[in-house]
Amino acid sequence: KFSGSVRCNDCELRVSSYGSAQAPVDCRNNCQVTVGSYAKFSNDIKASVLTLKISSGASVSSTLISDALTLSVDSYAKFSGAVTVNSRQAKLTVSSGGSFNGTFSGNSLEAEVGSYGKINLKGSAQVASAAVRVSSGAVFSAPELRVADYDLTVSNYAKADVWCSGTLRINASTAARITYDGPCRVESLTDNIR
């Protein structure tokens, strides 16, 4: 178990094998955090460029603040908290039963949900663009997030729920379920989109 604080220019932090860390991390440049094997991490992480990997039943409860973010959650791991990406793109990847449940604020979002993963984005922040791919059995839910332009790809037996004000481009399989709201213009509307 580690409790304290971490300050660095560049850092790499690993928590694994049922370990736990409750330390705020403040990193000026590149920060890589890996949490795996049923480990737990809780506290704020601030970094210019942040890479966070959560896997194998691990859990992270945190507020993430960065200029650029790459976040992956897989193998029944969980993330909960808040994400703010100030200038560049946020990349979220959730798969193999992993889950992301939190607020998002940023200009640009790229998300991929696969293998029964779930992304639940809360909050009503203004987002210029989002590209989202939802694979079979996965769920992407962001009904309050105010996204201008969406590029949405949804596979069979996957679900997506979004709000869009500009252009909503959809590539959906026949057994996909998509619901949307907002004053958007929909491209490639099919009968499984509501």
Predicted regions and their residues:
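Extended, compositionally simple hydrophobic/Ser/Thr-rich segments
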Residues: 1-194
